[in-house]
Structure formats: structure tokens, C-alpha cells
């Protein structure tokens, strides 16, 4: 075998077809796009379609799940609280509550309240009133002479049930 004898396998290379060049070619008029519809128009890309190749979002595995009962806490470290006290953005003499942390701009979000974490060092003697706290955070606050009061975030479950029952009553009344 010589280099000049090398050839591609039969059918490995396919000539390109010029479409839309008259009905005699067999690929005229609609050019192999069928009749009307999104795929017949120009400038359209089907989202996520990669020309028949398995798309990236389908190649990657599914992972995890959304826990309907999971708690959503805004987390704050005691080191950051100390920085805000030093910068006079938080008053170290008053109780530090969720509202105080939000007003100071230390936390955002967290529909189930604020959770205190133990990263950093706390020098000020402060009382925290939060929805949750880690063991390390509680130890660090008590070591500095302060205290942590854990109050679970108020869950207006009865309000949710009342709203649901009212909605159901309205739906039944509308159906009748």
C-alpha cells in the first residue's frame, strides 16, 4: 500500500446538495424544509438542539432534588457581626435581632429567619435573638460573655390553611 492509494471509505464523504435551485433538482422550492412552520423559516434555532448530537443538558446527569420541607435561613458569621459592631453599623449594647441585622445590611433573604454561624471572632458581649445557631457560634458568643436565644421563625400555618380553605370555597361557589 502506498500513500497515493489511500482513500476514504465508500460513503464516508458526501457531496453537498445545493437546495432551492429549481424543481428539476428535486430540492427546489421549499429546499427540503417541508411546508410552513417554525422550521421552515429563516433565523430560527431550536433551543438546546445540537443537530442530532445528544444535547449538553441531556448528556449531564440529573443531580439532587428540591426539598419541599427544607428551611431557608439567611446565614451570618459572628466575625461579620463583630466587624459591623466595630464600624458602628450595629449597636453592641442592644439585643441583636433579625430586624437589626437586616437594617444594618448584614443579611438578605432567608424566609425562615437568620442562622448564626461560628466563623470569625466575637469580642463584644452581645445577646442574639435568631432563628437558629450552630454549636460553634453559641460557644463563641458565650465565651465572649453574651448569649444566644433561638426562636423558631413564625410559621403562619393556620393562615395558610385559612387562605386555602377560602380559595376552595370560592372555587366551589363559582362551579355551582
UniProtKB/Swiss-Prot annotation:
Which superkingdom?
Bacteria
Q: Which Gene3D superfamilies match?
A: 3.100.10.10
Q: Which InterPro entries match?
A: Ribosomal_uL15 (IPR030878), Ribosomal_uL15/eL18 (IPR021131), Ribosomal_uL15/eL18_sf (IPR036227), Ribosomal_uL15_bac-type (IPR005749), Ribosomal_uL15_CS (IPR001196)
Q: Which Pfam families match?
A: Ribosomal_L27A (PF00828)
From the UniProt entry, list the residue stretches annotated as the region Disordered: 1-48, 151-176
What GO cellular component is one of the record's annotations? cytosolic large ribosomal subunit
| GO terms of molecular function | rRNA binding; structural constituent of ribosome
Q: Where is the composition biased (Basic and acidic residues)?
A: 1-13, 156-176
Q: Which UniProt keywords apply?
A: Ribonucleoprotein, Ribosomal protein, RNA-binding, rRNA-binding
Q: Coiled-coil intervals in this record?
A: none
Bias type Gly residues, positions: 21-35
Mention one GO biological process in which this protein takes part, according to its record: translation
NCBIfam families per the record? rplO_bact (TIGR01071)
Summary of the function given for this chain in its UniProt record: Binds to the 23S rRNA.
Q: Which PANTHER family match?
A: 50S RIBOSOMAL PROTEIN L15, LARGE RIBOSOMAL SUBUNIT PROTEIN UL15M
Give the protein family.
Belongs to the universal ribosomal protein uL15 family.
HAMAP family with a match to the protein in the record: Ribosomal_uL15
Subunit-structure text: Part of the 50S ribosomal subunit.
Protein name (record) = Large ribosomal subunit protein uL15
Q: Which organism is it from?
A: Erythrobacter litoralis (strain HTCC2594)
